[in-house]
Amino acid sequence: VVHDNCSLQFKDDLVIAADDVRLQRANQDLWRIDASGQLWLEGKKVNTNASTTQTLKDYQHGLRTQSHAVVGLVADAMQMAATAVDKVVQALGGENPQLQASVDQAIGTLKQHVDTIVVQKGGDIRINGSKINNADGKFEQEFEQAVEQSMMKLTGALMMSMGQSMSEGDGDFETKMAAFGEKMDKFGNDLEAEMKEKGDGLEARGEQICTQLRELDVIEQQIQAQVPAMKAYDLIDTSKEGIKAPKLGQAEEQGQG
């Protein structure tokens, strides 16, 4: 999560609560840091000097802030995707309730997968890293299947819309085909412009999160130097790429291929 050379490496579950931040495995605390900077490792209180306590306080505050930012970014990205798909459905004939229902179901499946990773309850956030990194890769497979299902439904709808356009109205096949192509080109250009504007905004937010994660990584390394046992729970790695969504252009190329 979320940008080039900027990622949170979740193997366990991060819990952002009102009073503290916790890293859990099988619902058992690996570490816990409260708002004052007090650290517990596997349930045992760790005494630290004033400097380390302040560093821990800054760390939990940074994790809290960035987790909320990432969750907001993911939610807005999902909304953008849903909006784009809805516009495609409308362009292909919004009077088709069966198509709308099937696409809504596919988008709903994607949202359900995301909701199993990020759980919000009141003001608390739980990021289930254990579900992302499960041994059999089941989550990744199911997520990819849901994406493929959405694209298959839209591709099928496009073919049906094309066939309907060819069978209606006057004129020969070539004329109808050209008119349909012009209609789809205009729609595609308009949609691309709208999604690019929104996508650029999301990317800018991702850049900001990435910058702040790099700063937080420095704090994390300071903690690991001061409390060596924390090295086992490294959350931030600025040397690796995070999970990235496909760019709009790539999706269009796949659709045109």
Question: Where on the chain are the PLM-derived regions?
Answer:
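Charged/polar interaction segments and conserved charged motifs
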Residues: V1-R32, M166, D170-F173, M177, ...
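Residue-level signal for secondary-structure boundary elements
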Residues: H68-V71, M78, A82, D115-V118, ...
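Short, surface-exposed, charge-dense and proline/glycine-enriched linear segments
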Residues: A82, P97-K121, T155-L158, Q224-K231, ...
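Short, flexible coil/linker elements and helix-boundary hinge sites characteristic
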Residues: G93-G94, E168, D217, D234
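N-terminal Sec/ER secretory leader and immediately downstream segment
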Residues: V1-L110
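Extended amphipathic alpha-helical interaction segments
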Residues: D104-E207
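A cross-kingdom marker for long, charged
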Residues: M177-G257
